[in-house]
C-alpha cells in the first residue's frame, strides 16, 4: 500500500451558506465518521456567504470553482467568485471568466470534462481580498443542469482536486471549497459530504501498489455505498 499520509491534504475551509444547515451538518458528520482521524484538524467548517469571508480575515492559497466545463462563471457560487475577484471597468465581473476560458483554450482546447481539475493563477489585476494565488477549476457538470444521476461525481471530482494540488509546482497549503454539485446539480448534501471524505480517506491511505481486483474492490464498494444517499 502506497500511503501519501496526512501531508497530502491541505487545510480546507468548507463553506456552506449561512442558511444551508444541511450541508454543514453533513460535512461535520462525514469528517467524524469517514475521514481518517489524522486529518480531522485539516477541515474547518464555515457557515457564511462568500462575501463575508474578508471580514473574518480568512486568506487562502487556492479557491475552488465547482464550475461548468466551459468556464463560464456567471451564476451561483461562480458568480460570487467573479464578483469577489473582479477586474476594473464596467465588465470587471467578467475578468475571471475570460482568464479561465483562456487557460481552458490553452490547456484543454476550451472544454474541461466534469470531474477534471485545472489550476490557474489568479489574475494579478483583479481584486483579491482572500489573497488567493490559484483558482482550481473543477467542473461538476458540462452545463448548468441536474447532475444527481452521476453517482460518483463528487468522489471523482474531489480526487482530481487533491491530485492537482499534490502535483502543483508550488505548495498550496489552504483551500476554500464549497459543496460539489449541491446547488444546480442537485447532489444531496449527504452524498456530497460522504464522497468528499471518502476521496480524502482513500487518497491519504493510498491505492494498493500492483493491486488486484481483490485489493481494489473494497475501496470501490465503499464509494458504491454512497450512491443511495
Q: PLM features: residue spans?
A:
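Macrodomain-like recognition of ADP-ribose-binding/processing modules
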Residues: 1-229
